[in-house]
From Swiss-Prot:
The chain crosses the membrane at residues 6-26, 31-51, 62-82. NDH-1 shuttles electrons from NADH, via FMN and iron-sulfur (Fe-S) centers, to quinones in the respiratory chain. The immediate electron acceptor for the enzyme in this species is believed to be ubiquinone. Couples the redox reaction to proton translocation (for every two electrons transferred, four hydrogen ions are translocated across the cytoplasmic membrane), and thus conserves the redox energy in a proton gradient. The keyword Repressor does not apply. GO terms for biological process: ATP synthesis coupled electron transport. The keyword Translocase applies. NDH-1 is composed of 14 different subunits. Subunits NuoA, H, J, K, L, M, N constitute the membrane sector of the complex. It catalyses: a quinone + NADH + 5 H(+)(in) = a quinol + NAD(+) + 4 H(+)(out). The lineage of its organism: Bacteria, Pseudomonadati, Verrucomicrobiota, Opitutia, Opitutales. It comes from Opitutus terrae (strain DSM 11246 / JCM 15787 / PB90-1). This is NADH-quinone oxidoreductase subunit K. Belongs to the complex I subunit 4L family.
Amino acid sequence: MIPATLNTYLVLSAVLFAIGFIGVLFRRNTLILFMGLELMLVASTLGFVAFSRFNGTGGGNVFVFFILTVAAAEVAVGLAIIVALFRKRQTVEVDELNSLKN
């Protein structure tokens, strides 16, 4: 088995971030947008953990806890907003959720 290097983790982090970014850019479903944002947060967390692991410092791990705290708050608020929008409009498509129309 080939040992994983810092570059391996950073490439994986970049690929995950790119997949999440593409999901945010090209999808019109709010749940998919939300999942893309979460994937981008996980990718940045992986980068911090990789730098922390290979540099021998614990500073990256502190940022991971902050990122996970923000992600947990984002999940709670984001899903509550999506559920409220679905109950009111019966859709989760971004194109149909114009609050300025009617």
